[in-house]
């Protein structure tokens, strides 16, 4: 069932997913193989590079809601516990700062254990938001 849904998501990808996939597909991004709309555990991730244990998530407007923040945190924690590094990009960055997004992906592929300050801050904000929702 989940695999059929993943197949549907691949068929019906958004414009930003299509734009990023065009840059990542066929090992043309630094020789790394990415998969799109890949089931991992109970989730379907937007893009994954298994050899780098890197997941890329593209976040639309729904991710800013209280529920979206809590869900993303739970999902990121699950994926992290299973050995993946999750990097999130808001959809507007794909459209307006695409070169910066590609540079950030390159950085994460070359430095799999490093988290830039902005990402550490974002993860802290997600944790605080989740704590408020759990209280």
Give the role of each language-model region.
Residues 32-33, 84:
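A generic structural motif
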